[in-house]
Amino acid sequence: MLSTSSSRPFKSKFRAAFWPIYNYELGKFIPMSALMFCILFNQNILRILKDSILISEISAEIAGFAKVYCVTPAAALFVIIYAKMINHLTFEKIFYYLTAFFIGFFVLFAFVIYPNIHIFHVHPDYLADWMERYPHFKWYISLIGNWGYIVYYSLAELWPNIFYVLLFWQFANELTTTEEAKRFYTLFSLFGNSSLILVGFLMMNLSSKETIVKHFINISDSKITLVQISTILVTIVAVICCLLIRFISRNVFTNPLFYAKAKSGRSTSERMGIIKSFKYIVKSKYLWLLLICSAAFGFAINLVEAVWKAKIKELYPTVNTYAEFNSLYILWTGVAIMVMTIIGNNVMRMHNWFVAAVISPVIIMVTGVLFFVLIVFDQKILSLFDGAILMSPLALAVSIGGIQNILAKGTKYSIWDTSREMLYIPLDQELKTKGKAAVDVISAKVGKSSSGLVQSIIFTIIPTATFTSISPVLMVVFTFVCLAWIYAVRKIYFEYQKIA
């Protein structure tokens, strides 16, 4: 009897640490985990494709311009449209309409625009002539001349913030209580982000010369085939997402066991108009701090990624080789996220919210500064370790940048994302929906576009500048932004304690 009773606390602690889900909760937990898996599956295929196409077909420098002048205006427009949609449509219909729009364009690009890019784009010689005539405006000319790549990149950039950050987490926050969130959210992250490993293996094969696809079809252009097969996969998984949304809406939201409001129905209180809604949001100090945190991540990581991706293109210049390397990076990012999720789950249980939330900015700042130091002082560092480093300076820069990004994304997509979502749960319905839409969609793009704006101003003023030459300036800006992020996390923790 003694051994049996003493084993119960051990089993209880083990379950609390690794599987804090009760059997009756599986009807809610499993479909939500599957939905997150599918959304992230598509997100990471699109991430590999958008960078491989844009950077290989044009350049790494153009990405900053695209984020400032295309992605951010599109994100702002979406928030306005979404605020209108949420007043007139159910969440289920909004999800279907947005999915149809995005998938429709991706299919159009893969099967019509990309294979016939010479028809839709300005001739490269004509474009090069105009860029040579007006060097200070060459990147703006390139944006217009390569519009197909830019629109694809912009929509692929918006996918994570619309479908994952906004729609999935809004769905989860509505369905999940604060107590459940502490147990569910890290496991959502664990199962959902395992899709990165699958995507990594899958895309490595599709982008390689020895792809399994060549045993079934004749490949005339490997990059076109890569994009088309990937788009078919994205379309199939998007349909599965819609079916999961339908299942959860019909079976989980209507079950009082899973959703407390099912007995009385969802809130039917009158919603605010757009202008009144945004005035309400602007007055919220809480949302402003959330916006700073989200924008700081986008700003900081984009500074590091911009330099790193320029180095990747030097080492892997074609669409397929770039995609193959990107797939390997995504795979290891998935592994890092799963490890960090397990760590984060226990950190969140054993410590307060601030300890868990501050891990991401600290790791990103430390690893980012190390990467910039390597880029800025590469020759001096290599001379210090003469003969000890068995790779070229370029390969070393790509490898260190990859490690930095894997650790940064690993902590962000596991510990920080789950910590951030807990901040929305105590808020009222208006801030949970429209407030979340404004923060999640706009803030990340404001961060990336602000970073892109810094880069675009430099490249416009100095047409001969490269990412390597401006790295010292970017390193200083990067450090300042990370410190601001840490400060905002501390301030919002005090606000969270007041309402939680």
Curated annotation (Swiss-Prot):
Its main location: membrane. Pfam families: TLC. It is a multi-pass membrane protein. Coiled coil: none annotated. Keywords: ATP-binding, Cell membrane, Membrane, Nucleotide-binding, Transmembrane, Transmembrane helix, Transport. Belongs to the ADP/ATP translocase tlc family. This is ADP,ATP carrier protein 5. It comes from Rickettsia bellii (strain RML369-C). The gene is tlcE.
